[in-house]
């Protein structure tokens, strides 16, 4: 039982990060009906920019508290990622809105490779240590037993889940109850009619990409804080998994991204925790990535609209 609880805790923490990344995919798809495969690499830029900003602040203001350094650095990274996302939309996607669907897909992959290459040149190939901001001492949530150790959680993990849920809830409220949200839904439904109603589709699309960039920066810092390092390649695989989470929940739907992210994290954690036992050691936890792609294949085959269905996914 302690092992099960531990894997569920791990899954919720991991799934919160996936869900936050998936929001970027689902927002863009909801409006433009394209998949921004450069989104995961914007996450990477956010994490590495935060790290560079912390190092610069530590050099310039050595007595500044580390938590304050993180706040300032995160604000800088969010601004950088928002501008980067706007640039990606402007130069990689805007002229391809009416092109065949394969064209923006190839363009997004090209931007992804470009961002990774530039990041590798700036920050080198080697993973860089990310500073420990919050206490990493484990907190026991169960008493354990003679067979299983107690299930644990860290302060960083708790903050990750709480912050992700708060951000996701805030986005849902923004989309449902604000003028900007009404504009986003109008453009998603019919850009031409939205224009006749006084909505500027280009401005809405630009803001959507910017918000996605901010979320990517936050997710990148969450990942780097939990794993203790950041690298030029850190965004690709989580980006693909977050895309899987968006498809699982119903791509284009904000609630679907939340649900899909949490579910995918739990599935992956349970698979990693029990795969070795079920296969008698033939496969270990290093095969956990297989579960994410199995989920993607199964959803595309049996329920392409995702868990929340085509109607809801289309409207969000």
Q: Each PLM stretch: what is its role?
A:
Residues 1-22, 49, 60-73, 99-103, ...:
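Membrane-interfacial amphipathic/re-entrant helices at transmembrane-helix boundaries
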Residues 2-10, 14-17, 174-179, 205-249, ...:
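Inter-helical junctions in multi-pass inner-membrane proteins, predominant
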Residues 4-53, 87-103, 246-254:
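Single transmembrane alpha-helix segments in multi-pass membrane proteins
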Residues 14, 149-230, 254-260:
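Helix-loop-helix "hairpin" substructures at the membrane interface of multi-pass membrane proteins
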Residues 25, 62-111, 118, 259-264, ...:
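Alpha-helical transmembrane segments within multi-pass membrane transporters and channels
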Residues 31-87, 91, 150, 274-282:
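Membrane-embedded helix boundary and interhelical linker motif in transport proteins
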Residues 41-45, 96-120, 234-247, 263, ...:
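Pore- or pathway-lining transmembrane helices of multi-pass membrane proteins that form conduits
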Residues 96, 104-177, 204, 270-289, ...:
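Transmembrane helix-bundle core of multi-pass membrane transporters
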